């Protein structure tokens, strides 16, 4: 085991000098004793002359030149398997929930090759989420990849928590949650939410939160993914939740300049597409088992063309776009039904009825969008009878796309609703065909199934 010395410390980036004949490989883990703390460094570059450039997986406060550094001769390894269920771990797989050792039987390196092309499998099976707008407009595939896109404060985390609650309770498999650069409070809420709904023993939690150094945030997604891969390779259907994939990119941006790379567009790292690809190519389903992943993607300044969200789009099967405009109308979940897409929305996969209903809803909403300008200038009276009907139905559909969430009961005061796909299709089809033209539009706001809207109308 070779030993080197620290020669330079700049923030999270540490340069270490080793003997010329014992230089560590790229991605090898190094260990340094920083006071009472054990700090792990990960090799990023070999600079020549026996010097390697590393990223610290923890705070580099108190590090100084001349400290001894040990080469562990392998990449960062984390515990995998059933021992991780119900536990909260950090980027190195160390427990942070004060419940003692993990007691794992096996450790895996966080850097692994993606499955080969022959091993990949393609599933057309749908995953019902119980959220009307998602099941109808952008259905999820079992073993598929879903992105929740949205700016600050439009409900990415709440939507993600509702999905976890619905899927983890309805779906009996294992889940892995990777909190990448998000708020510690949300991590805490999430843990208690899981404990209260008795699913904590089926979830492994890995956190690298906002207050942690960029090294932790850059690698914690890989830690969570490695745990999910182990469950998949045991032949299970596993769910992987990542909140938030943008912070993974951002952590790379933070260390990119310190690593001596030239920034590219908008100041992102030049290796943005490659780093995203390395992560996304591993989140995949094989012939042995599947990984269904839901990833929250922060959209800087609500600009979907920003390089970071734009790079993520290419890897996904379904995109759920949350819109500030819809949130400002008080419609939650604030999913934009015209902007959200799914590869599964195909008559061969979802069936003709579902496909026609979804496309019908889109065309009514699209027409309403076009008529809005006319209404704003001339008022409703100038519209033709046909257009007035379209507007009335569109406003009902818009309100019917809202739904009370289980995880938001505390804020809304109304009990959460799980709506089956069958009921969702029936409800929207009925509105489009004019069965509910006589009901006031308020009746459709924040209800579950169409029967509830009819009941609500009686009380109005």
UniProtKB/Swiss-Prot annotation:
Instruction: Kindly list the positions annotated as binding ATP.
Output: 150-157
Q: Extract the SMART domains matched here.
A: AAA
* Primary site of residence: membrane
> What's in the keyword line of the UniProt record?
ATP synthesis, ATP-binding, Cell inner membrane, Cell membrane, CF(1), Hydrogen ion transport, Ion transport, Membrane, Nucleotide-binding, Translocase, Transport
Keyword presence, 4Fe-4S: no
- Entry keyword Transcription regulation: no
* EC numbers: 7.1.2.2
Catalytic reaction(s) noted:
ATP + H2O + 4 H(+)(in) = ADP + phosphate + 5 H(+)(out)
Location comes to: Cell inner membrane
| One BP term from GO | proton motive force-driven plasma membrane ATP synthesis
Description of how the protein assembles with itself and partners? F-type ATPases have 2 components, CF(1) - the catalytic core - and CF(0) - the membrane proton channel. CF(1) has five subunits: alpha(3), beta(3), gamma(1), delta(1), epsilon(1). CF(0) has three main subunits: a(1), b(2) and c(9-12). The alpha and beta chains form an alternating ring which encloses part of the gamma chain. CF(1) is attached to CF(0) by a central stalk formed by the gamma and epsilon chains, while a peripheral stalk is formed by the delta and b chains.
Matching NCBIfam families, A to Z? atpD
Protein purpose: Produces ATP from ADP in the presence of a proton gradient across the membrane. The catalytic sites are hosted primarily by the beta subunits.
Question: In which family does this protein belong, per the annotation?
Answer: Belongs to the ATPase alpha/beta chains family.
> What HAMAP family does UniProt report for this protein, alphabetically?
ATP_synth_beta_bact
- The protein here is known as ATP synthase subunit beta
């Amino acid at each position: 085991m070779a030993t080197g010395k620290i020669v330079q410390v700049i923030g999270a980036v540490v340069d270490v000098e080793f003997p010329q004949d014992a230089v560590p490989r790229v991605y090898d883990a190094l260990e340094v004793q920083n006071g009472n703390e054990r700090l792990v460094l990960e090799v990023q570059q070999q600079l020549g002359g026996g010097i390697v450039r590393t990223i610290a997986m923890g705070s580099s406060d108190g590090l100084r030149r001349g400290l001894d550094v040990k080469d562990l001769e392998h990449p960062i390894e984390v515990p995998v398997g059933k021992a991780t269920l119900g536990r909260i771990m950090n980027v190195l797989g160390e427990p942070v929930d004060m419940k003692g050792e993990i007691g794992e039987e096996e450790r895996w390196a966080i850097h692994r090759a993606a499955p080969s092309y022959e091993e990949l499998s393609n599933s057309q099976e749908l995953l019902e989420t119980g959220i009307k707008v998602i099941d109808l407009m952008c259905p999820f595939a079992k073993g598929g990849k879903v992105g929740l896109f949205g700016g600050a404060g439009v409900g990415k985390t709440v939507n993600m928590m509702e999905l976890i609650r619905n899927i983890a309770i309805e779906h009996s498999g294992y889940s892995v949650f990777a909190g990448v650069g998000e708020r510690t409070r949300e991590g805490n809420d999430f843990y208690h939410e899981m404990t209260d709904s008795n699913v904590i023993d089926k979830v492994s939690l890995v956190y690298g939160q906002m207050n942690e150094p960029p090294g932790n945030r850059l690698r914690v997604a890989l830690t969570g993914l490695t745990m999910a891969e182990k469950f998949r390779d045991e032949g299970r259907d596993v769910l992987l939740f990542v909140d938030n994939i943008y912070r993974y990119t951002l952590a790379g941006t933070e260390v990119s300049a310190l690593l001596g790379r030239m920034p590219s567009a908008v100041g992102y790292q030049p290796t943005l597409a490659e780093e995203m690809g390395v992560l996304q190519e591993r989140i995949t389903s094989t012939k042995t088992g599947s990984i269904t992943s839901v990833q929250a993607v922060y959209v800087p300044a609500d600009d979907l063309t920003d390089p970071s969200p734009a790079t993520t789009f290419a890897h996904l099967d379904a995109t759920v776009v949350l819109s500030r405009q819809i949130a400002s109308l008080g419609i939650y979940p604030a999913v934009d039904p015209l902007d959200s897409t799914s590869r599964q929305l195909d008559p061969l996969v979802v069936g003709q009825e579902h496909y026609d209903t979804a496309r019908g809803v889109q065309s009514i909403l699209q027409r309403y969008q076009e008529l809005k300008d006319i209404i704003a200038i001339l008022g409703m009276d100038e519209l033709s009878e046909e257009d007035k009907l379209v507007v009335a139905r569109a406003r009902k559909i818009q309100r019917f796309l809202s739904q009370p969430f289980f995880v938001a009961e505390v804020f809304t005061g109304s009990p959460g609703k799980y709506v089956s796909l069958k009921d969702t299709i029936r409800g929207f089809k009925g509105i489009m065909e004019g069965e509910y033209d006589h009901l006031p539009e308020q009746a459709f706001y924040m209800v579950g199934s169409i029967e509830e809207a009819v009941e609500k109308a009686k009380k109005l």
